[in-house]
Every structure is written in structure tokens, then in C-alpha cells.
């Protein structure tokens, strides 16, 4: 019984995952469209909003070091990027985090 299910699942993946079904992508080196003086730090979480905009949680100019810093990051650490233009729609999170990581986006 298990062998039969394994064969069926294997056939399913073989049929569904052929090169014809794989979508290709094209790099847009103009996206995102951030201001010239903007510092995008280490991304610690990335999500997609209900309107398909990209939500980025990053560390700004903060670098990982030992001992851990005690000061909060001065830059906005959470960005909402427009899914079409790549421009910042909203940003917040300054003076909230020391060394952020992880992100969950809900409705």
C-alpha cells in the first residue's frame, strides 16, 4: 500500500514538475526603487501583504557584533514596498528594535 502511494506521488511530481510547468522570471535591476541615501540593512524577515506588496523587516545600519548592542536602531526597520513600482509606501519601526529577526504578516 505504501509503495503504491509512493509510486503515485512520484508520478504526480514527475508530471507536474516538468520544465514546461516551471515559470521563469526576469530580473528587474530597477526594483526596488529606493532613495539614494537609503540604507537597506540585513533583511531579517520578508513577507507579502494582502495587497501583494512586499513587507521587509531589516536591521538598517546595525551589524551583528559581540557584545550585543544596547541601543535601538535609529532607522525605520519595517518597509512596505509597492509591488509594481518598488517604491516605499510606508515605513516604521525606528527606535523600537535592537537586533530584530523574524516577520509574520497577517490580514
Question: What function would you assign to each model-found segment?
Answer:
Residues 17-107:
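Sequence-structural signature of mature extracellular/luminal beta-sheet repeat domains
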